[in-house]
């Protein structure tokens, strides 16, 4: 390739497809091709060209241009021989001409301008011993004119030691017309002795012997050309040592490069990743020296100093990986020695003084430095150096360093300098290589750079500067992992330089099974489709999967041909553009590939799902090119024929260089690695302790990984001490770092191998790089090929696994699938693996999105092995290890990876909708228990409880259960706000904060809402869904503002600092949040059905709040009788303590229904009657009804009364317990399917105590499975979609699963149902069959607001008796309002209560919670019996004291009916009124009996005139007047009870 000197640099680089570096060349003053002629490997590396293949292309282009430039400048010149000097003349000292040489890997074989032509022999390149074809650029020697030799050249190793004697004779032997060409001879050739030569591979002067006259033949008989070929082969071998082995082509061109500059580039494997073995130069000189301190106090400090030929570095110790100072050789002006064994290194900024231990050591340092300085100037390297342009510079604070440092970020490394002036001179503190590093942002303005050897903590000048530095470092670290070899080859097809979906330039991702090259944004949407549809790989990172055949496919196919297939029917104007939002982008890609809406019908696969399966199979099978060509039958334009497989193969062959056969024939080489490892002994114990240093430290062995892992005592040992075969490895695990950073005895970098037979062996390395290299090598060594692409940083465990899932039942029903698991980060990858069972399909599990992780013990499994159950949305996976040891390791690793602990939103454990569990749980709790709380989210809870709750959520959110009696609403709201406030990045994204503010500044509200929608679409998926959930919750809160007094403005003020993580003074953020809450329906595209459901829920909550104003907390509910028809509906108040038996009695009395011989039972109806649950008579009805809000359709639930025969449900109303437990054979099925599968199977079940047991046999003593019945609900019926085998069955709903049980007949179904209900309520007393309400006024707790007593306390024996009497009076008064009273019956308990001692205490309204007072006894019957036995007592007690008035449930007074004038009547109504008055009189006497003074015993018999009680007066003794006689005839002041 010819390159004229004045050719523009961009055009010149485009010849090798590297025009992206044109700007880099121009920034360094290289605008034309001629200005770049002096560049070599190191110069290109300093320019920022890190890819080795790119540097090789440019150097080959330079060599080609240099050869042609030499020919152009010398073809017209004549070559005349140089006259020989006199024999006795003193030989002149050769002086080398300053020039630029190439590195070892790029020997300049072409003549450079100004070089003597005697060192360039064109005949050598035509020698048949060196090459099989001649170069068209080389003329014959007869055509070359001679040029006078104006300067003698010194022999140099760069010319491969060419023999300088007899060149003319050699040229005459091979030239057709030797008489016309005279080959010049050197001006001086020493006959014996030595000459000083410069080796470009070394940076010091050396001495090489020169042959004596007559020694034209080599010692081993090899010719010049053969030595040149071997020398070049040795150089290329050293340079390409980091590449995978390839089959070299038969024709190896070892002479001047030809016009085909891409031939040698093809020798690089397209999937190879280069790791240079000579990046770090070997130190030429090192040792301990004393360095003079720069503070001026003349103090020498002990330093370890190294000089590697490029820079002088001094360290604190010989173990430190990073120096304290770096002095580049280019910054040193001179070195000179001084007295006292000291020498000075002089730079333009300061003088460095070092002191050695001896004079000889000082002279060695001085001579070495001075010789390298001379060689540097002879080579013509510029001084000071011209490094690549920094990506970012600035001042930073470094922890552990007193003053600020000046940091410069260049490609591949971060350089630290003391000042900007030191940066300009190149004198730095240290240079940190970014390969293998990571960046971590910490609090405030700080960030950490984590290297394998040390953590550098920096502090920026501001928060914005910290983010900029962290982003730039992260991008630079990512760039170090990139390999452009595959990308350059794929981009050689111009159609692949633009994304196949959105036309973005330079796409660096590809969907390998779809044949398209895509950009990074589209790659994320392709990944969302799943690996079964689109297998996404990176062109720069995932280089291990890019075989030569796949690269050829993409080169030939191209995006244009692929789009002819995938988008052949795409309507114009419906494509994507590079700036498309993620939402429309994902929808378009799903329609294009997942649904195949834009492709034309396929002749062989009309079903799109079959086509996708065939594409995946073609990528994994042989004959990739042929199969893909048949599947992707490309539609061409009219007049053209589609690309056939033969045409495809032909086009592929046409792309291959004709002179390089076999280039793409890869030689499969097994994974090899070698190095030292600390090898522990093989143990059989689970959880063996990690390796530790000290006396019991494991031996450090030399390990070689090839066909087997062999361990030797040393590198020279002939026999291995032990070896491991790949089939012996079950699992590989990376040991976590020590929990205590101060634990220096433990090896921080270690891994373990679990072997067959339950054995384990630990290994340890010296550093993180070595550990990662060993993990990658061993992982590829024993794992299948499908796992190799998944290896990388973050690997925790990999090994063989057994997999079973109901979703794979069609593939292998009832069988375990053989797979290979790989745990990386929080993802578990499952790959097919060879084994006795069928291979498992490729799959991936996001562990943090699991709903449940549990272990089924070996006793509960048929195969007597432990199973790990992973419950995900829509499916359940069962994992089983090879043995106990590896299963325990997998369980621990998966449990740790599935947990939380981070402060990032993506690091949280997720619920079904990709919402953090902590957010979902807190919002659900507040919705259920806090929407009615006044000042919700404004009232703060206890800080300690809130912090403790947040820590529990972060540790394991799945295990946290919020319960009303254990957690307060205020603590939960504080936890939710604190969680959003402490996120690493706010839920609204810090980078989008300017866009939020820009949207808030728009004038029109409609425009602002549309802008909000646009910004929300730019958020990540988790952020977008979490924000939508939070705003929806706040929308419901403000809907209940009439109850909780929290309007939209208040909520926005409270949540803006947490959602946007601002200081709370941002008015724009408050406005944004307020408008998001108000416009929730439109911004988040809520449809009308969802909006109606929200309004229904809010209306129901509001109704509950209105009814709660009554002390009893009653709720108005609808109850149906027999059928759910409007005519059969009864509306009544339901108190929180109303039981199902009491509800039944009230409804039947209201409707006047007769009981007869059948029983009436209250049923809870779900899913419009598909499931029916009989309520136990003692169950609280309101507690069950309040749980309907958690249902997907709350309106589908209701209460229904139905007649049930005494034989079916009679046992529920008796206190008799079953003597023998219920046991029988049932057909069962689990939802979701687990141990029992997804079909109904016959199993024996047993109800024992409060547990349901699953038995293998009827007489089995140990159950296979056990379920607690605490909190379980039993429903009659089974969902129809499950296809139950019989019509009679019931569903048992447990906490995390549903158990469907099918019976043979109705009697068996009722027998099992009542047995379970009896087991759940076996501590309840027997039910009394009566028709009256026994609702008490016990203390209620509705939501989180307990109903406190109105006046005083409710404890004490006196109050107990008073409340008991008031309850009976209230019950009788209430019952008389609904239905006639029954005849009272006396009881012994009531007689005992009258004899209890009472004390003088003030009477309070009944507000206490006394469970022992729930029995319905009639106190009036006792008094009636007493009155009949002693009439005088009746007349006396009737008028001793004014009667007490009765207190109602609401606390207000009720009038007592006035007795009619005249003598008492014997009618029933008059007797009933007189009886109540007598009861009140007796109650008053009971309370005040103890307070009667002893001085007036006659008062009880003193006659008094009868006095009718005033309807408004209420005689009440007060505590302030304890001495007032209670027997006085004058009533006290009219005051209510206090």
From Swiss-Prot:
Residue span(s) of domain Ras-associating: 1113-1206
Chain intervals with Polar residues compositional bias: 1425-1439
Gene3D superfamilies: Arf GTPase activating protein, Phosphatidylinositol 3-kinase Catalytic Subunit, Chain A, domain 1, Pleckstrin-homology domain (PH domain)/Phosphotyrosine-binding domain (PTB), Rho GTPase activation protein, Transcription Factor, Ets-1
Phosphoserine modified-residue sites: 1438, 1474
Biased composition (Low complexity): 1476-1486, 1494-1505
Residues recorded with modification Phosphotyrosine: 1399, 1404
Bias type Pro residues, positions: 82-97, 1506-1529
Site (Arginine finger): residue numbering on this chain: 938
Membrane topology, from the record: Peripheral membrane protein
Key words of the record: Cell membrane, Cell projection, Cytoplasm, Cytoskeleton, GTPase activation, Membrane, Phosphoprotein, Repeat
Domain SAM: 4-68
Residue ranges annotated for the Arf-GAP domain, each copy included: 479-606
Basic and acidic residues: bias regions: 216-241
Quaternary assembly: Interacts (via SAM domain) with INPPL1/SHIP2.
Protein name per the record: Arf-GAP with Rho-GAP domain, ANK repeat and PH domain-containing protein 3
The species this protein was found in: Mus musculus
Lineage: Eukaryota, Metazoa, Chordata, Craniata, Vertebrata
Gene name for this UniProt entry: Arap3
């Amino acid at each position: 390739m010819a390159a004229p000197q004045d050719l523009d640099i961009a055009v010149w680089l485009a010849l090798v497809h590297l025009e992206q570096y044109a700007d880099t060349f121009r920034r360094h003053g290289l605008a034309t091709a001629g200005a770049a002629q002096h560049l070599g490997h190191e110069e290109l590396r300093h320019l920022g060209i890190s890819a080795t293949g790119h540097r090789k292309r440019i150097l080959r282009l330079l060599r080609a241009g240099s050869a042609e430039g030499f020919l152009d400048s010398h073809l017209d010149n004549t070559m005349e021989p140089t006259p020989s000097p006199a024999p006795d003349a003193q030989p002149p000292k050769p002086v080398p001409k300053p020039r630029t040489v190439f590195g070892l890997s790029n020997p300049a074989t072409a003549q450079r301008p100004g070089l003597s032509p005697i060192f360039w022999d064109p005949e050598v390149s035509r020698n048949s011993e060196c090459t099989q074809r001649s170069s068209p650029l080389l003329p014959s020697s007869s055509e070359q004119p001679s040029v006078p030799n104006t300067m003698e050249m010194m022999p140099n190793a760069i010319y491969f030691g060419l023999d300088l004697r007899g060149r003319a004779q050699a040229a005459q032997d091979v030239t057709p017309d030797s008489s016309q060409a005279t080959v010049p001879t050197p001006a001086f050739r020493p006959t014996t002795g030595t000459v000083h030569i410069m080796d470009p591979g070394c940076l010091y002067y050396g001495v090489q012997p020169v042959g004596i006259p007559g020694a034209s033949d080599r010692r081993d008989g090899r010719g010049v050309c053969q030595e040149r070929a071997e020398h070049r082969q040795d150089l290329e071998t050293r340079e390409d040592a980091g590449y995978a082995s390839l089959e070299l082509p038969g024709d190896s061109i070892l002479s001047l490069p030809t016009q085909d500059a891409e031939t040698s580039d093809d020798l690089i494997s397209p999937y190879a990743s280069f790791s240079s073995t000579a990046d770090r130069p070997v130190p030429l000189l090192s040792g301990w020296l004393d360095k003079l301190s720069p503070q001026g106090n003349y103090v020498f400090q002990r330093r370890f100093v190294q000089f590697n030929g490029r820079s002088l570095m001094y360290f604190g110790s010989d173990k430190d990986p990073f120096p304290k100072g770096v002095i580049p050789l280019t910054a040193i002006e001179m070195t000179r020695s001084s007295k006292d064994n000291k020498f000075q290194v002089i730079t333009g900024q300061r003088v460095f003084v070092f002191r050695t231990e001896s004079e000889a050591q000082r002279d060695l340092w001085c001579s070495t430095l001075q010789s390298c300085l001379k060689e540097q100037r002879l080579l013509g390297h510029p001084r000071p150096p011209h490094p690549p342009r920094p990506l970012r510079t600035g001042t930073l604070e470094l922890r552990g360093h007193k003053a600020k440092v000046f940091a410069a970020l260049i490609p591949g490394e971060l350089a630290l300098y003391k000042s900007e002036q030191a940066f300009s001179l190149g004198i730095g503190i240290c240079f940190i290589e970014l390969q293998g590093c990571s960046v971590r942002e910490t609090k405030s303005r700080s960030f950490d750079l984590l290297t394998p050897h040390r953590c550098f903590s920096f502090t920026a000048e501001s928060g914005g500067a910290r983010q900029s530095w962290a982003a730039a470092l992260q991008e630079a670290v990512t760039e170090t992992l990139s390999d452009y070899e595959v990308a350059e080859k794929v981009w050689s097809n111009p159609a692949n330089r633009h994304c196949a979906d959105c036309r973005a330039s330079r796409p660096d991702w590809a969907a390998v099974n779809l044949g398209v090259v895509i950009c990074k944004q589209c790659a994320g949407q392709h990944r969302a489709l799943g690996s079964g549809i689109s297998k996404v790989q990176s062109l720069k990172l995932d280089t291990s999967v890019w075989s030569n055949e796949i690269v050829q496919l993409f080169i030939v196919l191209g995006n244009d041909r692929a789009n002819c297939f995938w988008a052949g029917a795409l309507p114009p104007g419906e494509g994507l553009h590079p700036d498309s939002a993620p939402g429309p982008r994902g929808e378009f890609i799903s329609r294009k590939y997942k649904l195949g809406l834009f492709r034309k019908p396929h002749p062989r696969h009309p079903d799109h799902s079959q086509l996708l399966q065939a594409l995946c199979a073609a990528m994994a099978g042989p004959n990739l090119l042929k199969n893909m060509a048949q599947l992707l039958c490309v539609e061409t334009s009219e007049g053209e024929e589609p690309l056939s497989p033969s045409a495809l193969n032909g086009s592929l062959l046409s792309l291959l260089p004709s002179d390089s056969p076999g280039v793409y024939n890869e030689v499969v080489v097994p994974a090899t690695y070698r190095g030292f490892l600390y090898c522990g002994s093989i143990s059989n114990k689970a959880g063996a302790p990690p390796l530790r240093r000290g006396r019991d430290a494991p031996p450090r062995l030399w390990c070689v990984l090839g066909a087997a892992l062999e361990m030797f005592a040393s590198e020279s040992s002939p026999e291995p001490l032990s070896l491991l075969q790949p089939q012996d490895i079950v699992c590989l695990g990376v040991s976590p770092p020590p929990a205590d950073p101060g634990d220096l005895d433990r090896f921080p970098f270690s891994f373990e191998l679990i072997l067959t037979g339950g054995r384990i062996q630990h290994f340890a390395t010296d550093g993180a790089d070595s550990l990662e290299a060993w993990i990658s090598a061993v992982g590829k060594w024993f794992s299948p090929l499908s796992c190799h692409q998944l290896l990388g940083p973050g690997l925790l465990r990999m090994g063989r696994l057994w997999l079973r899932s109901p979703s794979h039942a069609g593939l292998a029903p009832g069988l375990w699938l053989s797979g290979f698991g790989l745990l990386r980060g929080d993802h578990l990858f499952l790959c097919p693996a060879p084994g006795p069972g069928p291979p498992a399909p490729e799959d991936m599990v996001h562990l943090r999105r699991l709903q449940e992780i549990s272990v089924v013990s070996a006793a509960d499994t048929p195969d007597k092995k432990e199973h790990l159950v992973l419950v995900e949305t829509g499916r359940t996976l069962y994992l089983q290890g090879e043995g106990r040891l590896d299963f325990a390791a997998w369980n621990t690793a998966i449990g740790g990876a599935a947990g939380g602990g981070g402060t990032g939103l993506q690091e949280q454990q997720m619920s079904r909708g990709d919402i953090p569990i902590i957010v979902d749980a807190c919002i659900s709790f507040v919705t259920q228990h806090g929407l009615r709380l006044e000042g919700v989210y404004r009232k703060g809870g206890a800080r300690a409880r809130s912090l403790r709750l947040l820590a529990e959520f972060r540790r394991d959110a799945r295990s946290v259960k919020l319960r009303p009696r254990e957690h307060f609403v205020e603590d939960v709201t504080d936890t939710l706000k604190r969680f959003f406030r402490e996120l690493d990045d706010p839920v609204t994204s810090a980078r989008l904060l300017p866009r939020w503010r820009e949207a808030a500044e728009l004038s029109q509200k409609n425009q602002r809402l549309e802008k909000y929608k646009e910004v929300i679409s730019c958020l990540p998926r988790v952020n977008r869904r979490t924000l939508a959930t939070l705003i929806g919750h706040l929308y419901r809160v403000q809907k209940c503002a009439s109850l909780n007094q929290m309007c939209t403005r208040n909520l926005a003020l409270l949540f803006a600092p947490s959602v946007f993580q601002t200081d709370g003074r941002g008015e724009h953020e408050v406005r944004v949040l307020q408008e998001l809450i108000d416009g929730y329906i439109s911004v988040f595209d809520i449809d009308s059905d969802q909006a109606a459901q929200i309004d229904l829920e809010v209306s129901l909550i509001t109704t509950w709040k209105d009814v709660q104003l009554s002390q009893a907390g009653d709720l108005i509910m609808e109850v149906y009788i027999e059928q759910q028809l409007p005519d059969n509906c009864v509306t009544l108040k339901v108190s929180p303590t109303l039981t199902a038996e009491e509800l039944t009695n009230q409804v039947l009395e209201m409707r006047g229904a007769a009981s007869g011989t059948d029983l009436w039972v209250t049923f809870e109806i779900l899913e419009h009657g598909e499931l029916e649950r009989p309520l136990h008579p003692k169950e609280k009805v309101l507690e069950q009804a309040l749980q309907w809000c958690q249902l997907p359709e709350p309106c589908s639930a209701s209460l229904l009364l139905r007649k049930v025969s005494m034989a079916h449900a009679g046992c529920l109303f008796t206190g008799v317990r079953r003597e023998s437990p219920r046991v029988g054979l049932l057909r069962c099925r689990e939802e979701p399917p687990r141990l029992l599968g997804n079909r109904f199977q016959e199993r024996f079940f047993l109800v024992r105590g409060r547990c349901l047991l699953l038995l293998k046999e009827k007489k089995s003593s140990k159950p296979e499975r056990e379920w607690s019945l605490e909190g379980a609900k039993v429903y009659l019926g089974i969902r129809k979609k499950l296809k139950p085998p019989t019509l009679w069955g019931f569903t048992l709903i447990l906490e995390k699963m549903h158990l469907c049980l099918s019976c043979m007949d109705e009697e068996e179904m009722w027998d099992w149902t009542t047995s379970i209900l009896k087991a759940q309520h076996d501590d309840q007393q027997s039910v009394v069959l009566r028709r009256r309400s026994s609702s008490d006024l016990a203390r209620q707790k509705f939501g989180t607001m307990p109903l406190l007593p109105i006046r005083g306390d409710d404890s004490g024996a006196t109050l107990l008796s008073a409340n008991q009497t008031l309850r009976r009076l209230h019950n009788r008064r209430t019952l008389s309002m609904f239905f006639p009273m029954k005849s009272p019956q006396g009881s012994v308990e009531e007689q005992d209560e009258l004899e209890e001692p009472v004390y003088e205490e003030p009477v309070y309204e009944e507000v206490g919670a006394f469970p022992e007072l729930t029995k319905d006894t009639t106190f009036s019957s006792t008094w009636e019996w007493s009155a009949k036995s002693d009439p005088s007592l009746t007349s006396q007690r009737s008028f001793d004291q004014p009667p007490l008035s009765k207190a109602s449930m609401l606390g207000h007074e009720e009038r007592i009916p006035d007795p009619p004038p005249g003598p008492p009547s014997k009618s029933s109504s008059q007797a009933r009124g007189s009886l109540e008055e007598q009861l009140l009189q007796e109650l008053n006497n009971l309370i005040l009996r103890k307070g009667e003074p002893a001085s007036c015993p006659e008062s009880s018999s003193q006659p008094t005139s009868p006095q009718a009680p005033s309807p408004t007066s209420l005689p009440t003794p007060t505590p302030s007047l304890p001495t007032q006689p209670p027997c006085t005839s004058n009533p006290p002041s009219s005051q209510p009870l206090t």
